[in-house]
Amino acid sequence: MKVKSQKDYTIAVIGSHSALDVCRGAKDEGFKTLVVAEKGRDKTYAKYFKSRGPSTSSGRASLGCVDEVLYVDKFKDILSAKIQNELKRKNCIFIPHRSFEVYVNDYDAIENKFNVPVFGNKKLLRLEERIENPNQYDLLKWANIKFPKRFKNPKDIDRLVLVKAQQVKVSFERGFFFASSPTEFEKEGKKRIASGLISKQGLRDAVIEEFVVGTGVNFNFFYSPLAKRLELVGTDTRRQTNLDGFLRLPAPLQIEATRYLEVTFKEMGHTAVTLPESLIEEAMEIGERFVNAAQQKLSPGVIGPFALQSLIKPVFPKLEIIVYDVAPRFPGSPGIAATPYSGYLYGKSLSMGRRVAIEIKEAIKQNKLKQITT
């Protein structure tokens, strides 16, 4: 069959993280959608948001956004020849997000054994892991982007730091704690080892970063290789449990609560935020430097979405952006469609899922799919 339009393609995604954002955007641009779901974790996609009713002229079903569910016993089974052949038979373009990385848990296999066309640069995904070489810190250095000071040795701690250690039971989650001295680092680390949250090795391998006091803003960018343009699709901030609950308490009660509860930083979602327009130019320039560094060091560089998770720090009389985390793939931020930035560019607000689908649709039209997939 000769492929002619988006109707001949299916947009595929792992059933987790931001799959609905991907699927809604794809449906709105006339694509078929497929979610790879683990058995027993499928109702969100196979029932509650399943496509229903006849398609409209745009290719959009009257209700829902998931056309088809492909079942696997474990998400890692997506690497099997059987599942890959099925995805290729359906002419799928696969959209990677954080859960894809986490559940497959094998970047070498993603790069070398997953042969379904992937929207984006697969080589960038592993940068998210701070233990990789190179990693996100290296890319930020190459791009001359400011990030929190790191301490390689806890004996050098001379200010308030945030310690990020891999959890024992959930390896892709990190256990966080604060310390302001080597003694406090040792005390707090031992406490979490005793509770079973982290291991001794996890503490030895922990990332120790200066705690930056500022306002959290995630800059969700999209780089279009077709238009050679960087776009700010939207901005948001994290919601974390039980941290958000602690912050709602008056300070004396926060101190009292920590006698019985440990503060945790489990991500539970995002809230849309806006920026002062005076900060947009700096944010865009930082994004451009990131794109340029990736193109020079990790060809073909950035393709599509990425997020620079940042803190806005007051440096009188200006504001300064400090990037504390990089998401080199589709962000888990469906609420960014509520921010105005894509609307300023396109005349209507776009979700990241819609922006990705627009790029794929244009690449099909220009016969340049190979330019946006790896």
What is the predicted function of each stretch?
Residues 209, 217-254, 320-327, 336-338:
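Beta-strand scaffold of nucleotide-dependent catalytic cores
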Residues 3, 317-374:
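C-terminal active-site "lid" helix and adjoining low-complexity regulatory extension at the edge
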Residues 247-320, 359-374:
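A long amphipathic alpha-helix within ATP-dependent nucleotide-binding catalytic cores
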Residues 45-52, 63-161, 168-171:
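Conserved N-proximal alpha/beta basic substrate-recognition cap immediately N-terminal to
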Residues 19-24, 42-44, 171:
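Short N-terminal binding/cap micro-motifs at the start of the first secondary-structure element
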